[in-house]
Amino acid sequence: MNTVTENVFPPREPKPKWLRVKLPTGKNYTELRGLVDKYKLNTICASGSCPNMGECWGEGTATFMILGNICTRSCGFCGVKTGRPETVDWDEPEKVARSIKLMKIKHAVITSVDRDDLKDMGSIIWAETVKAIRRMNPNTTLETLIPDFQGNTRNLDRIIEVAPEVVSHNMETVKRLTREVRIQAKYEKSLEVLRYLKAQGIKRTKSGIMLGLGEKEEEVIQVLHDLRDANVDIVTIGQYLQPSKKHLPVKEYISPEQFEKYEKIGKELGFRHVESGALVRSSYHAEKHIH
């Protein structure tokens, strides 16, 4: 049994007022919510209780998770189950494409669990999902939020060949905390993945980090420098929230002013888009990042 599931951390601090969100409303949200419930569509927006769900759905954007809901990794920040994943569903690409068509999604974000149990690490299903979406939804733009595929270029090439408008891979945290937060991942390997994607012709690359895990300001700024050095175009910076008592605790709630400071620094470094705020998640304002 891994340490993430065994540890029980101290009681959580109450959330500050700037982390409170209004319940989602609006015609677009209501219609999409009805479709998701009726057809049991698998969006991480709903299953992950994302605070921005109403806003994103109102803009015609949604995020879908493929390759099941059990991950082979046990990252200390992540609420996705860890264990032995189920058999690959080879009909999944068509199912996701149909969901996008039913929901009339203008911009779709696709993400997945890590599948280190598979020889191709899930990259074939990834590519087939993009192809199916393109066939069934020719006007829908795409972002693929990919795992590191252990840095295997053959698997990365499968993503590159289907040419999503945006390819993202999250650093998640600063270099010093990577081993504690991401466990099986490596900071430099993630940077190598992002460099490779850009070098092989991906037009827009993107990455994201969470704050509140004990990082220092200078470490956050260093991540921003490292991402720019890797020619990353877009960065998202948000507040880490503890999914359960068994996950890493929140060390600090970052103030709105500090998020604004990081946004200013990111823009000065030359990122095309910087999304920085307590409620920002990887897919926040994703539809704007294709430009």
Swiss-Prot record:
Gene3D superfamilies: Aldolase class I. Pfam families: Radical_SAM. Its cofactor is [4Fe-4S] cluster. This is Lipoyl synthase, mitochondrial. Belongs to the radical SAM superfamily. Lipoyl synthase family. Its EC number is 2.8.1.8. InterPro entries: Aldolase_TIM, Elp3/MiaA/NifB-like_rSAM, Lipoyl_synth, rSAM. It is found in: Mitochondrion. This protein may be expected to contain an N-terminal transit peptide but none has been predicted. SUPFAM superfamilies: Radical SAM enzymes (SSF102114). One of its GO terms (molecular function) is metal ion binding. It is an enzyme of class 2 (transferase). Keywords: 4Fe-4S, Iron, Iron-sulfur, Metal-binding, Mitochondrion, S-adenosyl-L-methionine, Transferase. It comes from Nematostella vectensis.
